[in-house]
Each structure stands twice: as structure tokens, then as C-alpha cells.
């Protein structure tokens, strides 16, 4: 029997139990940190030569130059053309839905003119160049290519450079096909901290980017943290999370499988059920026991559920929503008979999946909204990846001669108050009297 925690809000120590359940902090491995610092410094100093050397070492390659580590657009197109029909159709359908959704996020500029002729506004411009990191090998995720690349292209990013390691020289054709569909401009078959360094600093072959997005292992995450400030980054993602709020009206097998869908990612993933019905919680646990033996990744799922999962009994749905807001999960399912009135009660979640038929996996692949979501409670202050992450806002100020008289006096007074006389004079020189 899976030893998943059973909690109840009526328990005297419920708060302490919740604190323990949610206590997760990504470990900082000093060995990884030292390795990454060394690799980044080497790439910054030696450029292509360092990238080739590390790629050969870590990915078991025999590249002699960066020319051996760049794929052409023809190779991306070949990967797309070579897909089985069902895979190509699914990839194209997902790409279309992701593009349609994200086109609605595009920010537009605005301005207004005051009575004295002064114009104020905001201009929206895309980033010039973005780097997309994609994990390599057999476990590569083409859906991540679509979710990261399409919003960038919708935003108007001029050049999108993808880096993807190819251990043993193995190319994932689905990933390359997704890159082709999403409009990726260049692909380098490099990975790890050396790829992050190449994107952040630029080398002879790899242009420096303005922002790096995409998931990666501990070395990649560490490297992204280290180069932040030189370039922008999307986020440092923690383990996957799902929280299901249920009232007992949905098939318990569905809920159990939804919990599995995140637990199968890795042992640190977190799957939580919050329910108003104790008997239904029992049925979900029975479904877990029944379905787990059928899962190829059952050991990972069981470890995840045992270490970080929970089945929580609450008094009512108001209490369920309050707990959900405290958790601020990456994925939140409202598995309720009448879910719509409860959506407004949720203030903190990466994405909300509403109703019995909205499985979290649809959001992962093809519903349309982005699957790059805030984790580890950061949905309290963060948002999903979107077009706005690839656009910048620039303030516009055009002061008329009349406006300079009014604003100049205000600015002069405030500047003198702050002890900045040159600021004051800059405004005063434009005053008529």
C-alpha cells in the first residue's frame, strides 16, 4: 500500500503538518556550483574552442569545430518531413493552438496628449535575440520547444537560437521537427553549462542573446542563475506540482491518474488531493493502489507520493480554496460538479484546470496556454511564460514648450530638495523666466 499522507484540517496539528508538507528548498550543490563557475569562465575566455571541448567530453562526440555542432534549416525540415503522419498532425495541431492562444497576449503601445501638448506613452518592442535551451537525449520534450519558441516568435523576436545536447550524437527528430514548426532560426547541438555560457557571452559561432529560456538539469539551472544580469532568464523551475480540489463527483480513477501525471516526473514532484468527502478520498486511494502496478514509472510515482504527496480532508470548498491559495501550485484542478463559481476564489496558481474533462496533461501538450509555469509557491508572485516575457516596455515622454514651464518648476523644487542641483538646473534652463 502506498504510504501517502492523510491530513485533515480538523487536526490540531494541521498547520504544522502542512508546513512540513510544503517545506522544500532546492539543494545548492557546491560541487555543481564550482564546476559551473569553471565552465562559464572557460567559455567566456576561449569561446568556441571551450564549447567544442566540453561537448566532446560530456556528450561523447568527436567534433573538430562549431561547424560540426550546428544543424541547418534543411535538417530541421527533414526531421519534420520524416515524422509518421500521426505525430506530425499532432505536433502541427498543438503548435497551431499554442500560437492562437499566445497571439492574444501580444502587448500594444499606447500614448495620450495633455492639454498643453505634452505627449506621454509606452512603446512595446520585442527582444532582438533569444536562446532556447532544450534537454537532449531520448527524454527530450518537443512540447517544451513549442511552449518556449512560439511565444517568442509571436512577440516578434528576430532571432531564436536553440541549443540541444545530443549525447552520443543522437538527434531527437521530434524536437527538431518542433523547432521547424515553431520558427527556430538556428540550432546548435550543445548543452550543459557550456551552452548557457555560449548564449550568455557569445562565441565566434554562437551570437550573444538577450534572454535564455527553457528547462535543464542542475548544471543548466545553476548556469542560468550565474549569468542572470548579463542576460535575462525565464525562471528556475522546481519540481512539478499538481493540486486537485475535489467534491467527490468525478471518477476516482481520473483523479488518481491526474495525481500520477505529475508524480511520474521525478521523486521530488508533489501531488496533493484536497476533498470535502472522506469516503471519496478512500476511493481515490483505492484507485491509486489499483492503477499504480500498471504504470511503467510506478517506482518513481510511489516514491513521489510517499515523500511529498497528501490526501487532505477539508470542511468545505471555501477551506479547500484557502489551502490551495496557500500552496500556490503549478497546476490546480477544480474537479467539481459546478467548478465555475470557485475559479474566482483561486488567487495563486500557475494554471487552473476547470471541470472533470480538463486533465492537466491537455495543458501540458495542446490546450494552448503555456506549460512553463511557476513552481514552489512562486505563483504567489509569478506568472506563466508568455509573449510578454519576450517584449519590453519603453516609456515615451515628449514635453511641449508650455509643459516644460509647469513641469520644470516641479522638477526644480524636488531636485533641490534631494540635493541634486544639476538636476534642478537642467529643468530651470528651459524655463522662460
Curated annotation (Swiss-Prot):
Pathway: Amino-acid biosynthesis; L-histidine biosynthesis; L-histidine from 5-phospho-alpha-D-ribose 1-diphosphate: step 9/9. The keyword Nucleotide-binding does not apply. GO terms for molecular function: histidinol dehydrogenase activity; NAD binding; zinc ion binding. GO terms for biological process: L-histidine biosynthetic process. It catalyses: L-histidinol + 2 NAD(+) + H2O = L-histidine + 2 NADH + 3 H(+). GO terms for cellular component: cytosol. Its EC number is 1.1.1.23. It is an enzyme of class 1 (oxidoreductase). Substrate binds at residues 240, 262, 265, 331, 364, 418, 423. NAD(+) binds at residues 133, 194, 217. Keywords: Amino-acid biosynthesis, Histidine biosynthesis, Metal-binding, NAD, Oxidoreductase, Zinc. Its cofactor is Zn(2+). Binds 1 zinc ion per subunit. The active site is at 330 (proton acceptor), 331 (proton acceptor). Zn(2+) binds at residues 262, 265, 364, 423. Belongs to the histidinol dehydrogenase family. Catalyzes the sequential NAD-dependent oxidations of L-histidinol to L-histidinaldehyde and then to L-histidine. This is Histidinol dehydrogenase. It comes from Dechloromonas aromatica (strain RCB).
